[in-house]
Structure formats: structure tokens, C-alpha cells
Amino acid sequence: MAEESLDTESRRRYPRLEFGIRVFEEKDWMIRDLNPLGCFIETAKPLPVDAEVNLQFQIPLDLEYLPIVAKGVVRRSEPDGMAIEFTEMQPVYYAYLEKFVEMYY
């Protein structure tokens, strides 16, 4: 099992950055893992697989908080949260996320 997860990690295009970021408009959504392609959101009320979501949050970058706005879809739903794949995002937000992950990883 550990070998399988290492293999999955090595195939990822981006590392997952563990971080606590609150999602605007959703009181109990907290981003736990984040990269430019998606995130894992901790919540007591995860949405079902294939549900579409609109996300707005901020990331600390270059001594300020920068906004991120993205559309996504739930790819995995678990009792403690859900994995989101970003499906639509302006290029500038994608660039912010790439830089954010590079800074902290």
C-alpha cells in the first residue's frame, strides 16, 4: 500500500501543499491540500462526486493576500471532505497557484 501511494505521488504533475485556507461563502469549508490543478476541502458536509463548485479564496504570496477564483468538480467524496479538480480558472490565478506551491514546497 505504501509503495502504491509513493508511485501515485511521483506521477503527480504538482506536489500537494498542505495548508489551511478558508473558502469564502462556505463557513465550514477549509482547503487542506492545494496545487494548481485542484484541492482537498475539509467539510462535515461533502458534496457528491461530479457536483460542480465555485470557489473563492485567498493565498498569501509576496507579502500580500491574492484572490483565487475557480470553478471545479468534485472528483472524490469522503466523510471528512472532498477532492476538487479545477475546471475553469483565469491564467493569472493559475500562475499565482504555481508560484504559491513553488514557494512553500
What annotation goes with each model-predicted range?
Residues D50-E52:
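Loop/turn positions that initiate beta-strands
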Residues I59-L63:
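Short, charged beta-turn/beta-strand-edge "cap" motif at the junction between a beta-strand
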Residues A2-E4, R13, G81-Y105:
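C-terminal output/interaction extensions
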Residues M1-P36, A44, E102-Y105:
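N-terminal helix initiation/capping motif
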Residues P36, S77-M82:
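Short, conserved beta-turn/loop elements at beta-strand boundaries and strand-helix junctions
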Residues I31, G72-V74:
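Conserved hydrophobic positions within beta-strands
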Residues F24-E26, E64-A70:
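Short coil-to-beta-strand transition motifs
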